[in-house]
Amino acid sequence: MRAAAVQLNSNEDKERNLGIAERLVREAAADGAELVVLPEKFNVLGSSEQLAAGAEPLDGPTLRWAESLARELRLWLVAGSIVETVEQDEKLRNTSALIGPDGSIHAVYRKIHLFDVEVGEMVYRESDVEGPGDEIVVADAGELKLGLAVCYDLRFPELFRIMAVR
């Protein structure tokens, strides 16, 4: 399976970000990609307030856009991550979705390991606005087994060992 990683400099303008992402996904598909992976928070990136303003449920406009694009281009699409609202929880989630060529969501992963660190005088506390996921996700993407992870999850090798065993 030919795969492509799409990179873009997202900001708080969701419409702009989706336009750029769509152009890049289409370019990857034209180059033969059967699996395209979008980056973390590809649809909206900014301050905590901007993330909250751009957050949406799984059935919101960003994943509907991704489902439509995957269906049209007949490819697997990892919607890198979006900022997800969760019913009855004030905390947001950093959520990745695997969408199939049929345009349906085949797997959903919510980032488990939140980035709460102090680097010199800088303090990062994702847990102030985001809640952790609690499920390790490995899904079928055609003949490929695909483990989903987001950003800081990379620092926890046990997550990937578990995925490999599955």
What kind of region is each of these model predictions?
Residues 8, 41, 154:
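Active-site metal-binding loops of divalent metal-dependent hydrolases
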Residues 16-25, 156-162:
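Short, acidic/polar
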